[in-house]
Amino acid sequence: MAEKEMNFEEALARLEAVVKELEDGRLPLQKALELFAEGIGLSRICNRYLEDAEQRIAILTADEKGGVVLRELGPSPAAREDTNDEL
């Protein structure tokens, strides 16, 4: 049975633990490389959750008649630039 995908909080907590282990600097090279690869994967999981949340955010604005309109908020210019950069 496939392991369920982590939620954002689980992925972020594990990513923080991986970073802490790597920053410690006492790992053998092979273990450090394995943790680095895991961290990249966790970073991508977190990024997907954040992108999904960003797409769901809606802002309320008043239309010209004073009514309330629900409008989807698109990604920020910085977020669009970041997604165009490949690692």
Swiss-Prot record:
Catalytic activity field: Exonucleolytic cleavage in either 5'- to 3'- or 3'- to 5'-direction to yield nucleoside 5'-phosphates
Signal peptide region: none
GO molecular function, one term: exodeoxyribonuclease VII activity
Residue pairs linked by disulfide bridges in the UniProt entry: none
Pfam families, sorted: Exonuc_VII_S
GO biological process annotation, one example: DNA catabolic process
SUPFAM superfamilies: XseB-like
Keyword terms: Cytoplasm, Exonuclease, Hydrolase, Nuclease
InterPro entries reported for this sequence: Exonuc_VII_S (IPR003761), Exonuc_VII_ssu_sf (IPR037004)
One CC-aspect GO term: exodeoxyribonuclease VII complex
EC number: 3.1.11.6
Compartments where found: Cytoplasm
Subunit structure: Heterooligomer composed of large and small subunits.
Cross-referenced NCBIfam families: xseB
Family classification: Belongs to the XseB family.
Functional summary from the UniProt entry: Bidirectionally degrades single-stranded DNA into large acid-insoluble oligonucleotides, which are then degraded further into small acid-soluble oligonucleotides.
Protein name stated in the entry: Exodeoxyribonuclease 7 small subunit
Phylogenetic placement of the source organism: Bacteria, Bacillati, Bacillota, Clostridia, Eubacteriales
